[in-house]
Amino acid sequence: MTNNTDKQTLKKLERQILRKTAQAINQYNMIEDGDKIMVCLSGGKDSYCLLEMLLLLQKKAPISFEIIAVNLDQKQPGFPEEVLPNYLKNKGVEFHIIERDTYSIVKRVIPEGKTTCGLCSRMRRGILYDFAEENNVTKVALGHHRDDIIETFFLNLFYNGSIKAMPAKLLSDDKRNIVIRPLAFVSEKETLEYSQLKEFPIIPCNLCGSQDNLQRVFIKDMLNRWEQNNPERKNVIFKALSNISPSQMLDKELFDFINISKDDIQR
């Protein structure tokens, strides 16, 4: 950071992101007294931002909770092994580096030129969930932000025919872990600017050489075009995800359409 203007911008932005993070945590009761929170740190802008916000909140919160940072070294070629340990040591944060060669497995299974992100993320999730259980972690914190949630909603809508996004808090399918997304109310624009001002040592996410998920790229571009025409478009879409009327949809599991009968008419 080079000048006072940047410092002032950082201070203002940090307060803004911290406020949104605290709102999400409070609204969804993400953190409880005595929690042991595992921050999944990839070396990307969002996970750095998540760790910073939780460390700031830890100092101010009326409750006590523990934070550990965990990185999964998947043995991708060119992965800078020293970056995260050096950063976390300087921050004074307890951390663990898990080493698993998932890269070789993914390369063996996925055909050349195809995106490896799906299989890679499933394997990564399983390893991190196992570590959380073995180390008595009560909450697994992920760095997904508002834009990730909106993009996932449209991916499921356009390509899977389902109305589904990313919840701010969930109990894993196997009931072994609780996952939280404290940055759920924070935009990608905010995490990007914050990471640039903080000068985080970013580790590229494409070391594996995988192609981008073209469906997600399409959705992101579409949303950005909408946002250019209407700067509040993403906010309105995000608001809609917490303003759902099951009786106005078509899902018989969410609303009892079958048993609506003439006997219900009141005149």
UniProtKB/Swiss-Prot annotation:
Coiled coil: none annotated. InterPro entries: Rossmann-like_a/b/a_fold, TilS/TtcA_N, tRNA_Cyd_32_2_STrfase, tRNA_thiolation_TtcA_Ctu1. The keyword rRNA processing does not apply. GO terms for molecular function: 4 iron, 4 sulfur cluster binding; ATP binding; magnesium ion binding; sulfurtransferase activity; tRNA binding. The keyword 4Fe-4S applies. Keywords: 4Fe-4S, ATP-binding, Cytoplasm, Iron, Iron-sulfur, Magnesium, Metal-binding, Nucleotide-binding, RNA-binding, Transferase, tRNA processing, tRNA-binding. Pathway: tRNA modification. GO terms for biological process: tRNA thio-modification. It catalyses: cytidine(32) in tRNA + S-sulfanyl-L-cysteinyl-[cysteine desulfurase] + AH2 + ATP = 2-thiocytidine(32) in tRNA + L-cysteinyl-[cysteine desulfurase] + A + AMP + diphosphate + H(+). [4Fe-4S] cluster binds at C117, C120, C208. It comes from the Bacteria. Its EC number is 2.8.1.-. Its cofactor is Mg(2+); [4Fe-4S] cluster. Binds 1 [4Fe-4S] cluster per subunit. The cluster is chelated by three Cys residues, the fourth Fe has a free coordination site that may bind a sulfur atom transferred from the persulfide of IscS. It is found in: Cytoplasm. A motif (PP-loop motif) lies at residues 42-47. One of its GO terms (cellular component) is cytoplasm. Homodimer. Catalyzes the ATP-dependent 2-thiolation of cytidine in position 32 of tRNA, to form 2-thiocytidine (s(2)C32). The sulfur atoms are provided by the cysteine/cysteine desulfurase (IscS) system. PANTHER family: AMINOTRAN_5 DOMAIN-CONTAINING PROTEIN, SULFURTRANSFERASE-RELATED. The thiolation reaction likely consists of two steps: a first activation step by ATP to form an adenylated intermediate of the target base of tRNA, and a second nucleophilic substitution step of the sulfur (S) atom supplied by the hydrosulfide attached to the Fe-S cluster. Belongs to the TtcA family. This is tRNA-cytidine(32) 2-sulfurtransferase 1. It comes from Francisella tularensis subsp. tularensis (strain SCHU S4 / Schu 4). The gene is ttcA1.
